Amino acid sequence: METVLKSLFFLLVATSFTLAKERKPQTLSRGWGDNLEWVQTYEEGLFKAKSENKPLLLINHRNDCPHSQALKKAFAEHQGIQKLAEEFILLNVVYDPTDKNLQLDGQYVPKVVFVDPSLVVRADLPGKYSNHQYTYEPADIDHLFENMKKALVLLKTEL
């Protein structure tokens, strides 16, 4: 009887492991690019941008915002962006950074801002919209890709 109970127990344990959903561990990418290296804080991003002479790409978003989620999906699926992003210090935040330089044209999400290694916020790399200049829709993903390229060119020509 004891052998039968042990066998039944091990069968139940094995079945539960087999049926359990495989979950990816939560990373700093929050789904924006799991194969990319992301920093945890704005301060860390600024430090690494300056010390590694790379621009900081800051994405301000919300987990409960459908526009943020749609942009995240487009960003993560765009192979060119994922490759080019390796040339940046990457940070995505779900809170509003307190740096007044990042406010630019107000508080909204999603907002994508570039900061160069001299710690200057690049207000000259906006999205397509006049009311929320630093927001992008999934349809604007190629415009974001072009702005990423411009940020790297500015790095080489201005700094």
Swiss-Prot record:
Renumbered ranges of motif Homodimer stabilization: 29-38, 44-51
Query: What SUPFAM superfamilies does the entry give?
Result: Thioredoxin-like
A GO MF annotation of the entry reads: identical protein binding
Q: Which UniProt keywords apply?
A: Endoplasmic reticulum, Secreted, Signal
Q: What subcellular locations does the record give?
A: Secreted; Endoplasmic reticulum
Q: Which Pfam families does the record match to this protein?
A: Thioredoxin_7
Family the UniProt entry places it in: Belongs to the AGR family.
The protein in question is named: Anterior gradient protein 2-A
Species name: Xenopus laevis
